[in-house]
Amino acid sequence: MKAKEIRDLTTSEIEEQIKSSKEELFNLRFQLATGQLEETARIRTVRKTIARLKTVAREREIEQSKANQ
């Protein structure tokens, strides 16, 4: 998911995406540990997606705090 696509989401949708991505990452790591994971690059992709989601969420927090001051 691109940062531009993430910015189009609402804050609650971003939080939901973070939650589902973390669950997916957990499952991928479990598959890796048991030797069932074939596409190991997927772990990296999911981690980067989580980082993008958290970055946009933090940007919104900062904007909101500046608006309140």
From Swiss-Prot:
CDD domains per UniProt: Ribosomal_L29_HIP
Domain of life: Bacteria
Biological process annotations from GO: translation
Keyword terms of this UniProt record: Ribonucleoprotein, Ribosomal protein
GO molecular function: structural constituent of ribosome
GO CC annotation terms, alphabetical: cytosolic large ribosomal subunit
A Pfam family per the record: Ribosomal_L29
NCBIfam families named in the record: L29
Similarity field: Belongs to the universal ribosomal protein uL29 family.
Listed name of the protein: Large ribosomal subunit protein uL29
Encoding gene, per UniProt annotation: rpmC
